[in-house]
Regions:
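Solenoidal tandem-repeat scaffolds enriched in leucines and small polar residues
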Residues: 137, 148-154, 176-183, 188, ...
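Trp- and S/T/G-rich repeat-edge/linker motifs of beta-rich repeat architectures
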Residues: 26-36, 71-77, 117-125, 165-169, ...
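Bacterial Sec-dependent N-terminal signal peptides
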Residues: 1-29, 48, 55, 148, ...
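Loop/turn residues immediately N-terminal
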Residues: 62-64, 107-110, 153-156, 197-201, ...
């Protein structure tokens, strides 16, 4: 008799979602690309499926892939085990009522059993004494519990899941149709529609006892004769959408039996060679073609044509679109021939992105530093690497201010009447007439003590009294209108003045890059310097102050280069400080903007923060939520009258309006995706494996006492912003000896 110890682990996982998502009315399409560089087995994606667990499946020319939002698991043929798939060239995917996944290949059909984590070759013999041996072109189910499979040169197969009986409709008894079925679909009445290679469109109302070609009631012609009908999908309002290689995309009204042409030629007069169709909503049809992606608004009769752009990282990765799938979050997956898979999260685009695309009418420079709106509503945008841009918020178009080619590093902007004062790095101040675009004045450092103290001007501020202050690398200047020169403020001599702000009381606040903050009290005509004191937690948190902001409640806020941000408390002449421990993602805070609801938006070195001043609650947005980049830039923000907020970063700038945000209530399912013993991944059915079935479907796990080094990989099956999901877990261990 010997003793053994068994450890039973019971695992409870709960997934929950944090975050809000929205879609702006003027919609832009930003895609996330997944390719072999991200773990995909091959870049030609022929088929896409989301299973009932929430996993995404991608069939390629070299393997089947399961994606959980963070990583891929690849399924390929392995001679060492009979549990693997028998062929790597995947052509079609379908999940049946039992949850099994049917996998079509270029040589036969396989069924993946998720609980067993294994594949089975579907080698059943049909009643007609045939079996599936050639390329599977399509798989789908009907409302009678049957799975239908289209196979090249073999017609259609129908498998009854309950009876386990296979029928083969070779179509050879219909001389007017070939056996090369490319697509098929059942309409609401149960009629089977079949698209063939070179023979057109057919339908059967009696499960292929009879078969009829589609004939247009308008001209009594076989509309799709000699065409390849490659896409068939059922739409709303009793219609079908038909895509073909020659005829583009048409809508077939099943009530009138009439065809309506939707898209046969694109905006350039080029033929649309349709590859795939997806009804994204009752009013929106997505069309995958050889020439890109077409998003067709069925209500308005208009479309958007999206193509790959080598200079645009958010564009499609390839123009040949072969597969489409809408997931349960509302996101759409686009499989391409050369570029892997692209993902468009429906609620991911409320951060509108602007970045250089290599075009003349695009943004010049991507290190966006300053925004300033002129009297015509044009937004002037200063960059640190591309000069000065003019942006029209209504048309969303750019024009480059050509003279700024001579001063590409812009640091400060201030509009004074119709003149834009431009502070530059090492090139002094340029004064631009915004009406004519002419540079009417240049101020630079000379031998005169009343010239600029330094040619690097980082901030410009006009006060309510009309005074103009300039912050430079070596001090503060006040412009003298009468003599058209500058007075140097001795209290700030030698100080790197980074920001200047006049508060509602007329006091002047200065942010310096090494000497804390200064405040000039206009009534007392005195300067006061606020510095960090490591022994005083209510002092300024850091001496490198980046910006100063006054909110609608007349509270003064300061941001710093390494101490977070703070709120000035005038009653005690102290500061309330907020840093990493308060919820900031990073202690470098660049800028603050207040929205119409009183929330403060803070740009940081690691994301965007929405801060509620009354509660201290912070919410962090990152690239996972749709930001252009996680690192923002200095003194780079602007808010329009309608509440649109512009924020600059080192990659361009974003625009958004918080009023358009809506909560995403989708709760992702949570799955254990992988199990490791002693650092090695273990699968069900392997010799010595403790797994009786797939770890994803295991509710308990029995381990021997010597199997004491193990780990799991867990995923919240969320694809819009997978890194924002949080997982709670509870371990319960039962040790049994006997």
């Amino acid at each position: 008799m010997f003793m053994k110890k068994v450890l039973i682990l019971l695992i409870c996982l709960i997934g929950y979602r944090i975050g809000c998502h929205a879609q702006m009315a003027d919609e832009h399409y930003y895609f996330k690309n997944l390719s072999v560089q991200n773990g995909l087995s091959q870049n030609t994606v022929n088929a896409i499926l989301q299973d009932r667990q929430g996993f995404m499946w991608f069939g390629t020319k070299d393997g089947l892939n399961r994606y959980d939002g963070l990583s891929f698991r690849k399924f390929k043929h392995d001679d060492r085990t009979r549990r693997s798939i028998g062929n790597n060239f995947i052509t079609a995917l379908y999940e049946d009522a039992k949850g099994d996944i049917w996998v079509g290949t270029d040589v036969g059909l396989y069924i993946y059993h998720p609980e067993k984590d294994s594949f089975r070759h579907f080698a059943e013999l049909s009643v007609e004494n045939t079996k599936i041996e050639h390329t599977v072109t399509a798989i789908s189910g009907d409302n009678k519990g049957c799975v239908w499979v289209a196979v090249e040169s073999q017609g259609l197969f129908c498998y009854d899941l309950e009876e386990g009986k296979l029928r083969n409709y070779t179509l050879k008894n219909f001389p007017f149709i070939s056996t090369n079925v490319q697509s098929f679909v059942f309409d609401n009445s149960g009629t089977l529609w079949i698209g063939c290679y070179g023979d057109g469109l057919f339908f059967s109302k009696d499960r292929l006892q009879t078969l009829h070609p589609y004939v247009s009631p308008v001209d009594n012609q076989k509309t799709y004769e000699n065409d390849v009908v490659i896409g068939l999908v059922k739409g709303a309002y009793n219609c079908l959408y038909v895509g073909s290689l020659k005829g583009g995309v048409k809508e077939l009204n099943l009530t009138s039996n009439k065809l309506h042409d939707l898209l046969s030629e694109d905006e350039n007069g080029e033929s649309v060679f349709c590859r795939e169709l997806l009804v994204a909503s009752d009013n929106e049809l997505w069309i995958g073609a050889e020439s890109g992606l077409y998003i067709y608004n069925l209500r308005m009769g208009k479309y958007v044509h999206l193509r790959s752009s080598i200079n645009d990282p958010y564009s499609l990765s390839d123009n040949a679109i072969y597969s489409l799938c809408k997931d349960r979050e509302g996101g759409i997956w686009i499989g391409s021939y050369f570029g892997g898979v692209n993902y468009y999260p429906r609620f991911y685009t409320y951060f509108e992105k602007y970045y250089p695309k290599g075009t003349d009418n695009g943004l010049h420079g991507k290190r966006v530093r300053e925004f300033c709106q002129d009297n015509q509503g044009i937004l002037w945008i200063g960059t640190e690497d591309g000069g000065l841009n003019r942006f029209n918020p209504k048309t969303k178009t750019f024009s480059f201010f050509t003279p700024s080619s001579a001063f590409t590093n812009v640091h400060g902007l201030c509009l004074i009447d119709n003149h834009l004062w431009v502070g530059t790095f090492s090139k002094g101040v340029k004064v631009v007439d915004t009406r004519t675009g002419a540079i009417v004045k240049t101020y630079q450092k000379t031998d005169s003590p009343r010239s600029l103290i330094d040619n690097s001007v980082f901030s410009i501020c006009r006060t309510t009294t009309g005074d103009i202050y300039l912050g430079t690398l070596f001090g503060l200047l006040r412009y003298n209108r009468q003599s058209d020169d500058f007075d140097r403020i001795p209290e700030l001599n030698g100080r790197f003045v980074y920001d200047i702000k006049e508060d509602s009381g007329g006091n002047l606040w200065l942010a310096t890059y090494a000497n804390g903050a200064y405040c000039y009290n206009v009534s007392e005509k005195k300067w006061k310097n606020y510095l960090h004191d490591e022994n005083n937690p209510k002092s300024l948190p850091y001496d490198k102050v980046l910006s100063i902001f006054e909110d609608s409640h007349r509270q003064i806020w300061l941001t710093t280069q390494g101490g977070g941000f703070c709120r000035f408390q005038p009653d005690t002449d102290t500061f309330a400080n907020y840093n990493l421990s308060a919820g900031l993602p990073n202690d470098v805070v660049y800028q603050i903007v207040e929205d119409k609801d009183g929330f403060l938006w803070l740009t940081t070195n690691n994301g965007l923060v929405c801060f509620q001043p009354n509660t201290g609650v912070m919410k962090v947005y990152t690239t996972s939520n749709g930001l252009l980049g996680d690192q923002f830039n200095y003194r780079s923000s602007f808010e329009t009258e309608d509440g649109t907020i512009y924020l600059g970063s080192i990659d361009g700038f974003i625009a958004f309006n918080p009023k358009n945000f809506s909560e995403n209530k989708f709760i992702p399912s949570v799955a254990i995706t992988d199990f490791f013993l002693f650092g090695k991944e273990v699968y069900a059915g392997e010799p010595g494996s403790p797994l009786e079935k797939s770890i994803t479907f295991s509710d308990q796990l029995v381990l021997q006492s010597n199997q004491n080094s193990f780990s799991f990989r867990v995923a919240a099956l969320d694809f819009q912003a997978p890194k924002t999901s949080r997982i709670m877990y509870n371990w319960r261990a039962l040790i049994r000896i006997g």
